[in-house]
Amino acid sequence: MKKYGLIGYPLGHSFSKGFFNEKFENEGIEAEYINFEIPTIDALLEVLASNPDLEGFNVTIPYKQKVMSFLDSITSEARSIGAVNVVKVEHRNNTYHLKGYNSDALAFKQSIEPMLERFHKKALILGTGGASKAVNYALRSLGLETINVSRYERPGTIQYQRITPSVIKEYNVIVNCTPCGMYPHFDDCPQLPYEAMDSKTILYDLIYNPDETMFMRNGKQYGATVKNGLEMLLLQAYISWDIWNNND
């Protein structure tokens, strides 16, 4: 039986296992999808050694960047993004070749593009991790100017305390790429001047549990258009399946 899986830590919030195993059952596919909750990225080698029939795996927090040093090849797009969330395991003469891809960027682009209007020209990206890199790549490919927001001073980013109402008016697309507000921390949300938002504001939260985060709820209160990350997650899962089945 073929195996697929997900590496990350922690994985209590994982959607992929249920999605893929339901797909396999419904379509009569002889395969299973397993969560590999590994406390360090070095444990990936043990996962590979103990699962010789592993055909591919997804990568989530906090390993989308760290996994890259373990790969034999990486697509040019994933290298440009600087993060990998899909790995194809190619078996060759009793060994394996690991190839890294990024499906987050295309999935996010397909999800947010229908929401954009001509007046959406600048975006704030909350967070600096692997997911934020894919979001940045996608938004720039759509012609938007972007800037990352961080809790800490980092080159090329701004800190939350510098986001004034006038910044919110100018950067009217805001994407949360942090775990702030994720289950079980329902009451948490990024500290922003939500009162400056209006009907021209888009709030996109990569979180999908809960369905409506406090970030989204606060924006809706002032007329913002909001969306969670479920559609993006579904799209990247479909893209992952295509990659693993030689449709890349």
What does each model-found stretch correspond to?
Residues 2-115:
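Phosphate/diphosphate ligand-binding glycine-rich loop within oxidoreductases
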Residues 8, 102-105, 112, 116, ...:
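Glycine-rich adenosine-cofactor-binding loop
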Residues 29, 143-144, 224:
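Short phosphate-binding/catalytic loops that engage adenosine nucleotides
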Residues 34, 124, 147:
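Conserved beta-strand positions in the Rossmann-like core of class I SAM-dependent methyltransferases
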Residues 110-111, 224-248:
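Active-site capping/gating segments
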Residues 141-159:
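NAD(P)-binding Rossmann-fold cofactor-contacting core
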Residues 156-227:
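Rossmann-like adenosine-cofactor binding region
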